[in-house]
Amino acid sequence: MDFSQLGGLLDGMKKEFSQLEEKNKDTIHTSKSGGGMVSVSFNGLGELVDLQIDDSLLEDKEAMQIYLMSALNDGYKAVEENRKNLAFNMLGNFAKL
């Protein structure tokens, strides 16, 4: 590889990363717990965009806390897994050059 091309290559990767981040923002990851009594949705940037709690849980604070923690943790894991996949794909594209 010609090192004089490295700057252009890095600029290209930066642009590709920005495009992937923008596209990723529109990706939604939904996790449920308690048999669907709690549902959380995150966009690809890790921002919580929706939270649904079944009305029957409003009387059972402890169960609601457990289900919320479970759904949130699963949602965060899905977002992180997606980020890893994007990073590996970018590195794979870089290796091809």
Curated annotation (Swiss-Prot):
The keyword DNA-binding applies. Its main location: cytoplasm. One of its GO terms (molecular function) is DNA binding. Coiled coil: none annotated. It is found in: Cytoplasm, Nucleoid. Pfam families: YbaB_DNA_bd. Homodimer. This is Nucleoid-associated protein HP_0035. It comes from Helicobacter pylori (strain ATCC 700392 / 26695).
